[in-house]
Amino acid sequence: MLECMKNRRSIRKYTDQDIPESLLNELLEVATRASNTGNMQLYSVVVTRDPANKEKLAPAHFNQPMITGAPVVLTFCADANRFVKWAECRKAEAGFDNLQTFIASTIDAMLFAQSFCNAAEEKGLGICYLGTTAYNADQII
């Protein structure tokens, strides 16, 4: 893994090769092992394969060609919703309407995303992490 990390670089042009669902699921499963806030896993991942949906996402990412050129686009989201529902089921107060929640969920999403990226690169896949989600989240939601 160290050699992979030392040699990593953003890949902006992709082959037509599809990413098998089994490999994608394996990478997502591995990434769930990432450190996170109190095991609350305050993130969600949206997987986009459909070319029409990638076209719709492109403007939110400043029309960078990696969005439409990649076989699959993953959008990593800070998301406390699942934990709030868990707390409600237990008649507990989640207390997630503050800056701390924003920070914790953002950190969780970033840790998950980085773990996913490391695992994908270890499997020989090229990735390009785009920070544009933060600029245009309202267009993506």
Model-flagged regions — what are they?
Residues M1-I141:
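Acidic, surface-exposed loops and disordered segments
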